Amino acid sequence: MVIITIALSLGMSLFSSPLLANTENNRTESRDKYLNIMTVNKPQYDMVKKIIKDKCNVQYMFTNEKDISEFKYSESVLNNISNMDLFIYSGTSFEPWSASLIDELKKGNLGIINLARGVRLLNYSNENNTKENPYYFEGIEEYKIALYNVKAAIQDRDPQNRDYYEDNYNIAIKEFDKNIKLYEDKLKSLSEYRFITLNNDFDYLTKSLNLNTIQLDNHEIAEFIKINNLDPKKVIIIVDGENGTKLDLSAYNTIKLWKYYGDMSFDDLILYNVKELSKWAKAKETTSVTTTSEA
């Protein structure tokens, strides 16, 4: 595996919720097709690996979100991606440069796959401004749709091995559903809590889990809790595991969740957040409990 970075310019040559798909009794597998696939980040790479296993070649460009955001592509990058069979990207502002990069690619035999196809994207609510929320991959159904898009794109490029990719997709979905189901009862018990969010970053996750949320406005946290008639003992404040917060929350229940973690697959990221939330199912009422777990 080669991690593609800006150093490509040095001259390295490399280059709707979907249900379980229907399968047939007769399985055939041909190994005469070898696809070269490029993804933007490592979690997308992990999605592809669930479908192809070791059959094809897949590479990724970045791990860190900051590197993705600040990326400036070169002619060498354009040429390398253009020589791939598939280029897979999130399809949102998570990769702010993706639209212009795609415009400059030499399409030829290159397939360009938008993972957000079929996903109902949410927006940030910021005064009179509406901005797209790119973190759809933290949502359960949204992740399934994205994985389905990966599977469908690979099947389209390698139809002779359609059944092989179909089976791998079904296995991945069943495993994911089984892991989430383990926490189903604990998640239901969270209905007694009110989750205060500091922004919209975790909207996909909280909606997926039907959490009772309320977003902090410009009031001080103590005043906000009082105005909204909230029980401080039954309030949990969601804090970004990466960015944290400058607010003094030492007197309140908090939980650290992650909207993106480059070294963790999207399904593992969802499961991590679910596990952290589930810890509150048996938590005793206290006046000050702080959760500081990190990925």
Segment roles from a protein language model:
Residues 3-13:
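Hydrophobic membrane-insertion alpha-helices, especially the h-region
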Residues 11-295:
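Extracytoplasmic metal-acquisition and chelation regions
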